[in-house]
């Protein structure tokens, strides 16, 4: 999913309809056909016809303009619903790679309420972390460094949000370093609280899930 300059995915907070809100008019197909494809995709996924939605997303990928994070997100979600873990993680890898290439990747982890550890059902996140560590190593291989930042919604006090977001960023950094020791000196963790909230309603539900994100972006290395 693309948010301005941000490329991100979400399977735990955002509504499925948001994950499927694609701008198909940018594809090299007619506007009428693009509109029809978008409607078919949304209906198939929200109607729980995941085999059909997967086929449609794969057909979009065959178009040169279809190779983008939002489409790979659809492939990821559809495969996950079908219990196809390996194809789902391959799609996640493409999302992570394209986000890193775009210099900013936003990912929604499902943290425990008010805490800096992941929710109990963290089964996809272990695989996410492994892939993110691989892509982070590639992104910093040329001597650049990376900032891992955490963001919160507008509910609660800002000092608390700042502290919580830093704890979450440090948690994600440590998970990455556990996978790739060479990342320890290349990643800095920062917490921004709600200062960069994108929705900023403070509702703490799926409508403002984008506010509670982890971002990966290039940063200057410490001298």
Residue spans of the language-model regions?
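Alpha-helical linker/edge segments of TPR/alpha-solenoid repeat scaffolds
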Residues: 80-91, 97-107, 112-132, 197-199
């Amino acid at each position: 999913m693309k948010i301005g300059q941000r490329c991100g995915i979400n399977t735990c907070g955002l509504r499925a309809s948001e994950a499927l809100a694609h701008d198909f008019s940018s594809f090299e197909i007619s506007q009428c056909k693009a509109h029809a494809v978008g409607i078919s995709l949304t209906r198939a996924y929200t109607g729980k016809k995941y085999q059909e939605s997967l086929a449609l997303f794969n057909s979009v990928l065959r178009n040169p303009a279809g190779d983008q994070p939002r489409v790979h997100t659809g492939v990821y979600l559809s495969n996950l619903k079908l219990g196809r873990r390996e194809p789902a993680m391959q799609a996640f890898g493409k999302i992570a790679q394209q986000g890193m290439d775009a210099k900013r990747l936003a990912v929604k982890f499902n943290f425990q309420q008010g805490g800096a550890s992941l929710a109990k059902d963290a089964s996809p996140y272990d695989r996410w972390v492994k892939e993110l560590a691989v892509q982070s190593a590639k992104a910093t291989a040329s001597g650049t460094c990376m900032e891992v930042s955490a963001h919160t919604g507008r509910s609660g006090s800002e000092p608390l949000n700042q502290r919580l977001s830093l704890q979450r960023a440090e948690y994600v950094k440590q998970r990455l370093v556990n996978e790739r020791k060479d990342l320890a000196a290349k990643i800095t963790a920062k917490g921004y609280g709600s200062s960069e909230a994108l929705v900023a309603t403070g509702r703490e539900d799926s409508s403002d899930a984008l506010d509670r994100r982890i971002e990966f972006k290039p940063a200057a290395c410490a001298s």
